[in-house]
Design a protein with these regions (language model features):
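Internal active-site segments that recognize and position negatively charged phosphoryl groups
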Residues: 133-161
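Conserved small/polar residues in nucleotide/adenosyl-binding loops
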Residues: 170-172
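Short, glycine-biased loop/turn motifs at secondary-structure junctions and
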Residues: 62, 95-98, 153, 162-167
Length: 172
């Protein structure tokens, strides 16, 4: 999937799913321009996620769920399409199972998750003068570093697997 130049997600209080979804899009297209709003403009040309009832919005019925019953949130929906291209099918599945599913579960059910809580603390408090979008992008910067580390780790495992496979062929 080619990442367009523009992205749109919901405004207001943000959560780990839209923050990590944005981080993923920035990793794949560093120059992407993300807009936050409450209504997707009719003439918007780009990728829309966590709003708008499209392919990457989980706020619609029936909710898409994984075979294990965990419902997708925006990050999981994007990762399902984009993750394998970054780390391969096997590592994408493992990252989904171990990292993304707990975030998606929190977003859909309120299940306790410390990382989701930490991302949530970037939201400005009720009497703050901070710009909500600026707070969102601070959270995205942290999420992006975490996700880049996840991707690098997964690709290191892929390189190690290849090396072991090469060595095993030599010794046959």
């Amino acid at each position: 999937m080619k990442i367009p130049a523009n992205g749109f997600t919901h405004a207001g209080k943000f959560h780990a799913d839209d923050v990590f979804a944005t981080a993923l899009l920035q990793i794949l297209r560093p120059d992407i321009k993300i807009t936050r709003g409450f209504v997707v403009p009719d003439d918007f040309d780009g990728i829309v996620y966590d709003i708008g009832f499209g392919m990457f919005d989980h706020h619609q019925e029936p909710r898409e769920t994984r075979p294990n019953g965990i419902p997708y949130a925006a990050f999981g929906l994007l990762w399902r399409v984009l993750g394998p291209g970054l780390v391969g099918e096997r590592q994408a599945r493992l990252i989904d199972e171990n990292f993304i599913q707990p975030l998606d579960l929190n977003d859909n059910t309120g299940e306790q998750n410390s990382l989701c809580d930490a991302i949530g603390f970037f939201n400005p408090v009720w009497d703050s003068k901070e710009d909500q979008d600026a707070c969102f992008f601070k959270a995205v910067a942290v999420a992006k570093q975490i996700l880049e580390n996840q991707i690098e780790s997964a690709n290191a495992v892929n390189r190690a697997d290849e090396k072991v496979q090469q060595l095993s062929l030599i010794h046959i």
